[in-house]
Amino acid sequence: MTMTDPIADMLTRLRNGNSAYHDEVVMPHSKLKANIAEILKREGYVSGYRTEQGEKGQNLVVELKYGPNRERSIAGLRRVSKPGLRVYAKSTNLPKVLGGLGIAIISTSGGLLTDRQAIKQGVGGEVLAYAW
């Protein structure tokens, strides 16, 4: 069965694994998912990620991050632009997530960027997801 929205599937797996206090979450690999995982790692939401060979191709393994008393580092993840309703934003009106406490993941002509990076570079694009 084909997957309609692989990004939403990734975010749901991360959200569910985070809620269940899993140490790792495994999902099918793609370059876009690896780039999203890289942004989440760089911003401090996950501790790392790696690619492993699975039975049906490559898998992306994301290592979730928790505080000293098992506090979750990801409070929320939300898909914004969906296959049925694409959401685009100019660099002048990119969204602020929780007043700047969270991040928006933007797909631009220069690759995936956070909202702060896109504003700094003066580029807009498709708003893929929010993380806080």
Curated annotation (Swiss-Prot):
Gene Ontology MF annotations: rRNA binding; structural constituent of ribosome
Record Pfam families: Ribosomal_S8
NCBIfam families reported for this sequence: PRK00136.1
Protein family per UniProt: Belongs to the universal ribosomal protein uS8 family.
Organism per entry: Saccharopolyspora erythraea (strain ATCC 11635 / DSM 40517 / JCM 4748 / NBRC 13426 / NCIMB 8594 / NRRL 2338)
Superkingdom of the organism of origin: Bacteria
GO biological process: translation
Name recorded for this polypeptide: Small ribosomal subunit protein uS8
Record lineage: Bacteria, Bacillati, Actinomycetota, Actinomycetes, Pseudonocardiales
